Amino acid sequence: MAFLKKSLFLVLFLGLVSLSICEEEKRETEEEEHDQEEDDKSEEKRFLSLIPHIVSGVASIAKHFG
């Protein structure tokens, strides 16, 4: 009977360890995705801030040739 208890505890322990590892990997993946989303948003903001400069540049070129 003691052998069965030890085996059962070993199986449960190994199951918990593998579950913990899977959850940690899942958390890391979610953090990487979140970081990627933040990078994409910051790139979009940088591009949007350049639009007024581009428009004014195009307008000045149009005046020069127009």
Swiss-Prot record:
Q: Report the locations given in the UniProt record.
A: Secreted; Target cell membrane
pH and activity:
Optimum pH is <7. Is active against E.coli ATCC25922 at pH 5 (MIC=12.5 uM), whereas is almost not active at pH 7 (MIC=70 uM).
Show the segment(s) annotated as Disordered.
25-44
Where are the Phenylalanine amide modifications?
65
Q: Which residues would be cut away as propeptide? A: 23-46
Q: Which UniProt keywords apply?
A: Amidation, Amphibian defense peptide, Antibiotic, Antimicrobial, Cleavage on pair of basic residues, Cytolysis, Fungicide, Hemolysis, Immunity, Innate immunity, Membrane, Secreted, Signal, Target cell membrane, Target membrane
**What are the record's GO terms for cellular component?**
extracellular region; membrane; other organism cell membrane
Q: Mind telling me which Pfam families this protein's record contains?
A: FSAP_sig_propep (PF03032)
Q: In which tissues is it expressed?
A: Expressed by the skin glands.
Segments of skewed composition (Acidic residues): 30-41
The signal sequence is: 1-22
InterPro entries the UniProt entry points to: Frog_antimicrobial_propeptide, FSAP
Family of the protein in this entry: Belongs to the frog skin active peptide (FSAP) family. Phylloseptin subfamily.
Protein role:
Antimicrobial peptide with high activity against Gram-positive bacteria, low activity against Gram-negative bacteria, and moderate activity against fungi. Acts on bacterial biofilms (S.aureus) with the same potency than on bacteria. Acts by causing bacterial membrane disruption inducing leakage of the intracellular content followed by cell death. It adopts an alpha-helical amphipathic structure in membrane environments. Also shows highly potent antiparasitic activity against Leishmania species. Shows low hemolytic activity on horse and human erythrocytes (LC(50)=39 uM).
Q: What is this protein called?
A: Phylloseptin-S1
In its UniProt entry, the species of origin is given as Phyllomedusa sauvagei (Sauvage's leaf frog)
Q: What is the lineage of its organism?
A: Eukaryota, Metazoa, Chordata, Craniata, Vertebrata
